[in-house]
Amino acid sequence: MNDDVVVSVLCTAYNHEKYIRSALDGFVNQKTNFRYEVLINDDASTDHTAAIIAEYEAKYPDIIKPVYQTENQYSKGVSITKSILFPQSKGKYTAICEGDDYWCDENKLQKQVDFLESHEEYAACVHNTRLLDCRTGGSWPMYKGEQDRDLTFKEVVNYSAACFHTSSILCRREWFCIPDELRANGFGDYPRAVYMRLNGKIHYLKDIMSVYRMFTAGSWTARNQNNASKQQRICSQKARTDFTEKLRRYCREQGVTPEYQKAVNDVANRDQLQLAVLQKGGRCLLHGPQLGIFMGLSLEKKIHVLDTVRTESKTERNEKR
């Protein structure tokens, strides 16, 4: 086996004592013909997360490489994966898995590396994920009936969030860190998905090889399980609209293909209209600049915007009751 590290796995953990063993077992049980490392940041957990990580560090010192924080870095606005873990990584490829999710296929890394090693034009390889509702215990695949295939740029940029889960990503090191012009928070790995697809193809494997725990304490799904207020919906849509405007400028400056620019323009215009609907109501589509933008959208995007109008009207009626 070559001594060079081929894959660096980046893992963030905070108060994950109920879940972290599953994540660590998924890491150390990988069967590969190459070396890999797991860089895991414990963000000053107040439970036993750090102690559990230390157990695995002692047992698998060549794999588990922890960083134990004495002060919580996330609360200080630090991007842990970009600023702490990635600079220490050595791998040709980068994988991600948060401490409350886990891998459920011991051949996951080998399958993805095998694909990328034989297809240099690809920026990343991703796969299907099982969603696990921690409130009910129910689970289901993120996608049903899919086949192995390439993800088009249009479908990647069309999604409101990434069209694959974070725990499924294996990408080439050079495409992991998003440039500052495209950095954004609040909607998962959508910016990273778009950036990777701008720089190469993304191959999707139908195999379910990871599990995403939903509604764990402190998770995004737990924080957003209740209906958001009108102001929260506006703030969320504004963040997305700001990002797609950044993306529009970035693509223009980078001189991407007309096909890609058209896809980005369509999405940015859709987001602009959805923000206008939230701020001014559906009637804003009937006149002024919004009408012109709406008429220029593809049929698919027009339907999307009209769905927003219907959903917002229904939500407002319910809030008044």
Locate predicted features.
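Short aromatic/hydrophobic "clamp" motif used to bind/position activated sugar donors
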Residues: 94
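Acidic donor-binding/catalytic loop of UDP-sugar-dependent glycosyltransferases
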Residues: 48, 101-115
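Short, acidic, metal-binding catalytic loop of nucleotide-sugar glycosyltransferases
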Residues: 25-35
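Flexible acidic/His/Gly-enriched loops in nucleotide-sugar-dependent glycosyltransferase catalytic domains
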Residues: 61-64, 69-87, 110-176
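A conserved acidic beta->alpha catalytic loop
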Residues: 42-51, 71
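Conserved nucleotide-sugar donor-binding catalytic segment
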Residues: 87, 127, 145-228
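Catalytic core of nucleotide-sugar-dependent glycosyltransferases
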Residues: 212-216, 222-255, 287-288
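Cell-envelope/extracellular polymer assembly enzymes that use nucleotide-activated donors
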Residues: 5-8, 37, 191
